[in-house]
Amino acid sequence: MSTNEQLAWDFDDGDVAAVRPDTGIARFAPGSEQWIAALQPTDDDAIRLDRFDVNMMTAEAAARLWARVAAWVESDQIAYYIDDSPVSSDAAYDARMRCLERLEAAFPSLDNPQSPTHRVGGSFSNDFTSVRHPSRMMSLDDVFSIEELKDWYDSVIRDLDWPESKPLPMSCEVKIDGLALNLIYRNGVLEQGLTRGDGVTGEDITLNVRTIGSIPANLGGPKEDVPDFVEIRGEVFMRWDDFHTLNNEQEDAGRAPFANPRNAAAGSLRQKDPRITATRRLSFYAHGLGQLTWGPDHPRGTHDVVADQSQAYDLYTKWGVPVSPHNRAVTSFQEILDMIEYYGEHRGDIEHALDGIVVKVDDLGLQRTLGATSRAPRWAIAYKYPPEEVNTELLNITVQVGRTGRVTPVAVLKPVYVAGSTVARTTLHNGFEVKRKGILIGDTVVVRKAGDVIPELVGPVLERRKGREDQLREFVMPEFCPSCGAKLSPAKEGDKDIRCPNVESCPAQLTERVISLASRKAFDIEHLGEQSAIALTNPEENRPDSVATYAPNITEVLVAPGEEPDPYEPVEGLELPAAQKPVLSNESGLFNLTAADLRDVRVWREAAIVEVHETVGANGKKKKVRKRVGGSGLWHQVPAFWTAPTPAKKLTAKQLVERAQGEAAIESAETQGDTASETTGAPTGAEAPLGTMPGFAAASYPEYDVPADAVIVRVDHKTTRTGVTDVPVIIRPGENTRKMFDEMDKARHADLWRVLVALSIRRLGPPTARLIASAMGSLAAIENATIEDLTAIDGVGPEIAESVVNWFAATREPGDWRGATLRAWQAAGVGVDEAETSSLPQTLAGKTVVVTGSLEGYSRDSAKEAIIERGGKAAGSVSKKTDYVVIGANAGSKAAKAEELGIPMLSETQFAQLLATGTI
């Protein structure tokens, strides 16, 4: 990467990752400069890339195409592996990856360790401690046709010089669509659970792993079968029945359901609170073996190693570690095809989402002979099934407004099951795409997915239109923003996307910005998620159009199986409540919010239709079974941040004594103070309650548990055997609300780079924000920086620099909302801390170091951080100004450049010495 080249992962959803339609690419000669510039990250253009012969290109054109496609693949990897929110279909992603691989094969200078083709999985988030894997955790190469699979099979036979007449033992197993996990056991005890991360370093998620019931805390079986040390590789996933149960619970709680089991498993495994993970019913199957050590004193002896995959699985079974039942031993290519055909027909019948079939050479010695590339073993391959296509009805086309104001049409589909999940909505990108596909509302349409990712609406089934023409209608893009009513228009001439220009106060844009600033890559306010953001910025979302669907006292509609709900008739005189004003009209007030501000915020929820029937259990007793079958179309309001009115709990005798003792101790301490405060109310320093209703003082009900932050809203008169008792009914901030405010307090002291990301500066993502924050040191310095100042920072390109400078220039305009936000945040203590300086010795001060190739002890990012933390400059390209080049495995053209310029080249061991001492 050149000094000022834009980092691919710094583009936001309005740039590289945005999915746009064909821009007239067919008019240009394939491989030409115009053709490359016209390419867009759409499925259609991905197909073009897949069919394109890269060997006809010049080296210069190939480099341009590589950079463009690599940026899209980088964005896809970030979205899939880090955000758990894929933006492209598997088919499109795989086509782009194959294009990169062909380019790198045809033009070796493009092949470098930083290429997405060498990346194992995705980089990890910063929520958990980074830990090095004892042995590298590889990914798998994919093939998408029987021909490609046969080529791999033949290459294995050829590389092993295997006799044609001799069967080669292999194993076949289903490829689980979950998250890779490395379990580390020492002397039979689970020591750590690590995510794959980049293959060298993963996240320590041990606490969450311990909550997964199928993972044993201690290895079982005879003592002589338990090694001193072992790494067990496998997959964490969610079974279909557990996934459906979780989504029902999500919807019943008013939370958005997960799109598919992989996303559900990922979100569950990365919870900061292990108690949440424990409720998610995750499962685990082992599928590989890492480092294995029996130890010198072990009965088996140090040389008694596992010989093949089958023996490893036998050991796992003895230890109580689950292995997928969907595996077979095979000895011929035809048996592999039989396995693929069987699960292709029965992929919907197994207990989890299926992502393909994995084929492995069974013998571990032969595996070592075959070796591996920089990212994947040569002794294994994953066959991916082709995309599934199904037909369904296009019920409607609505529009949604994104964070950058882009207005996107969304297809509302009759729910249909495809490739592992139920699909009810999918993006159509823009109005031109709708016209290009030729779809009409009411059409029968084709929907497809490759794996469990975002679906694509392919087009209409034209034969189904016959005789239904009067039921079809054309979609027309709106002229005005559906969220704020502003006039819509393209951002610049020639744009096919239309945008809402009301950046400051459009509720939809504001909601998306709040979601973004609270995300892990910014302030990391976990309990300020999508639903909370909507409640703060647009609480009237989903407000009924009329009283006909307003049912304030109906939270669910119970029906017998197969029955329809009774028609709803609103009571006479019922009126819709007055519309609420949002608590936040822009981001500036976020850090000034108090719990009291949120007390009356209510959001709209749809009453669920629940089927109820009785069944007889194994014990002969009857029990009621409830099943959520959909929405009723009836709406009611619920508190968004505070609890519903709840009778206070009566204290036990023991609790009353403990309270009295605590109050006496406080009173004694105050009385003995050197300077007692003369007060008539609460003692000095005591936090007053958020407010109580007149006449309802908490002190009037000493026998009840009324928390300090609670409000007594009424008093119920409860009749008991001893007479009438007054019971206070309270509301208080919910647990999630209290956690949200705690996290917001921590965010006031967030790292400077996180503040920059939270400001939603166009094109500025976390990596470049880190570079700028580290180089400039303070928000004040960044505010006053010029484009030249920023482009002088290695890794900051002119487009990003201009965007940052323009953003801060706008803050100085009178009345500008960005300036108001910045000043309000600074007044609340946000962004006033200077960037932390490293406490490590500055052994590399003034030195420029380039790292190329794969290092065993460092990921790409951790190597750069190690250099920067010691005062050095981690450059992306080799020049005369470079002091050292660290050479890892599979180093590319940078090594040749260093040799040409006579720059010292270091091994990983020498790199460690350089970090420690500054010399070699």
From Swiss-Prot:
InterPro entries: BRCT_dom, BRCT_dom_sf, DisA/LigA_HHH, DNA_ligase, DNA_ligase_AS, DNA_ligase_CS, DNAligase_adenylation, DNAligase_N. PROSITE patterns: BRCT, DNA_LIGASE_N1, DNA_LIGASE_N2. Zn(2+) binds at C481, C484, C500, C506. One of its GO terms (biological process) is DNA repair. Its EC number is 6.5.1.2. The keyword NAD applies. The keyword Secreted does not apply. Its cofactor is Mg(2+); Mn(2+). It holds the Pfam family DNA_ligase_ZBD. NAD(+) binds at D90, A91, A92, Y93, D94, S139, L140, E173, R196, E235, K360, K384. GO terms for molecular function: DNA ligase (NAD+) activity; metal ion binding. The active site is at K175. Keywords: DNA damage, DNA repair, DNA replication, Ligase, Magnesium, Manganese, Metal-binding, NAD, Zinc. Transmembrane segments: none annotated. DNA ligase that catalyzes the formation of phosphodiester linkages between 5'-phosphoryl and 3'-hydroxyl groups in double-stranded DNA using NAD as a coenzyme and as the energy source for the reaction. It is essential for DNA replication and repair of damaged DNA. This is DNA ligase.
